[in-house]
């Protein structure tokens, strides 16, 4: 899959995946979603983001963990 809204630039944020070249790491967006922040609130607090950015960040994160060995859980 090609992610048109995710950029990885070694000269920006140490190469951390970011949204559209902004200094907004994908991980930050994912954390906000995981903490229960509605997309509308994320967009309100970060007006440079668009709804599609949040959606693509979620897809990117899902793909990033899809075929990786995951840490063991307590179950």
Regions found by a protein language model. Give the residues of each.
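C-terminal structural segments of small proteins and small subunits
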Residues: 48-75
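N-terminal first-folded block
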Residues: 1-24
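Amphipathic, hydrophobic secondary-structure cores in small proteins
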Residues: 16-19, 23-57
């Amino acid at each position: 899959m090609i992610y048109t809204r995710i950029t990885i630039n070694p000269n920006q944020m140490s190469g951390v995946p970011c949204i559209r070249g902004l200094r907004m790491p994908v991980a930050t967006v994912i954390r906000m979603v995981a903490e229960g922040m509605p997309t509308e609130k994320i967009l309100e607090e970060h007006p440079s983001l668009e709804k599609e950015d949040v959606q693509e960040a979620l897809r990117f994160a899902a793909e990033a963990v899809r075929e990786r060995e995951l840490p063991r859980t307590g179950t």
